[in-house]
């Protein structure tokens, strides 16, 4: 596996410069951060669920997870303001590149019935958000020690101004986008 940062500088930057006509290397879109968020609704009843989720997230990302708290009370969910409801990790620099490399080359191919990630998950400002239904697709998670299968949100923040620039940037890293299906008659 080649270092993704090196791939970015050697392959992706020249391709994007040629395609979009950037006159300066600094205009080329780049990754800024990756935010991995895990909501743990069961933490309201039992704090052990949150501790297990934090342990899983730290194993996956290699960085200490931050606990997230409820902003306001919702009686229907038996939720009080300030109660712990999840955890998140913000990855930058080396950890960001390593996580993206593991996500693309190791984790996503292990998803059941995987046909590629959606091309419609861009937010209009060059950021890409995807949801993962099972944390067990990551090789760092021991399947036998998992108490409950949880999902997570992964938000890839880029400096791209448009969705097309961000799509080309991620495609340069071999992000497996879903192929468009044509009419087979």
Curated annotation (Swiss-Prot):
One of its GO terms (cellular component) is ribosome. Gene3D superfamilies: 3.30.1440.10. InterPro entries: Ribosomal_uL5, Ribosomal_uL5_bac-type, Ribosomal_uL5_C, Ribosomal_uL5_dom_sf, Ribosomal_uL5_N. SUPFAM superfamilies: RL5-like (SSF55282). It comes from the Bacteria. Keywords: Ribonucleoprotein, Ribosomal protein, RNA-binding, rRNA-binding, tRNA-binding. The keyword Cytoplasm does not apply. GO terms for molecular function: rRNA binding; structural constituent of ribosome; tRNA binding. This is one of the proteins that bind and probably mediate the attachment of the 5S RNA into the large ribosomal subunit, where it forms part of the central protuberance. In the 70S ribosome it contacts protein S13 of the 30S subunit (bridge B1b), connecting the 2 subunits; this bridge is implicated in subunit movement. Contacts the P site tRNA; the 5S rRNA and some of its associated proteins might help stabilize positioning of ribosome-bound tRNAs. This is Large ribosomal subunit protein uL5. The gene is rplE.
